[in-house]
């Protein structure tokens, strides 16, 4: 199980969890998870399932300070050498189709403005490249041989096969993947601070038509928490 919600440099702590040397609470303390991923508690049952299944958990994300520095520096090419060395040397830039999609999606951030959008797009791509590199490296490693990989990340990193999938395919020609998107559950509650940082956006079918591929291979639709729940989610292939 590969997760975005922990940064790859923290893998040694996650390895201790994988070996059963520490529990979930100790893992959260070792990785400073509450500060680095505020809604980290939502992933306790996910890691519990992985432990029960004896599945290795791999941290995918780039260092959050480095990604923020991409934005603050004005883009990848303006990063200090030390920060640039933390990111993959080869990146798919420019990436016109994905960049157009990101220019629509990233407007959800209240701070997004046309003059600030380019560094935000490059920060997203830098994160995607870092996650794709970590995932590809683990797949090629002795520990990753003959394993099926489950990747848990936000929809914006995988929708329409853009983001992480296309970058993994570039590194692993012939790799087979399936993308599953989950509907909103209604269970997540944003804080006043998070609500203040966001704004409503609408992306139309016409705006994404030129991508010419489905948003995912499968959609898993779960009834909202405020409504009576049937026995199981309804999942279907697109």
Task: State where each predicted segment sits.
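A structural signal for short, well-ordered beta-strand segments and their strand-loop junctions
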Residues: 1-2, 56-61, 151-152, 179-181
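Solvent-exposed loop/turn segments at secondary-structure junctions
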Residues: 3-8, 63-67, 155-159, 184-187
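Context-gated lysine
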Residues: 4, 25, 35, 52-54, ...
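A substrate-binding/cap region within the structured catalytic cores of diverse enzymes
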Residues: 9-138
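Short amphipathic alpha-helical interaction segments
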Residues: 123, 127, 153-160
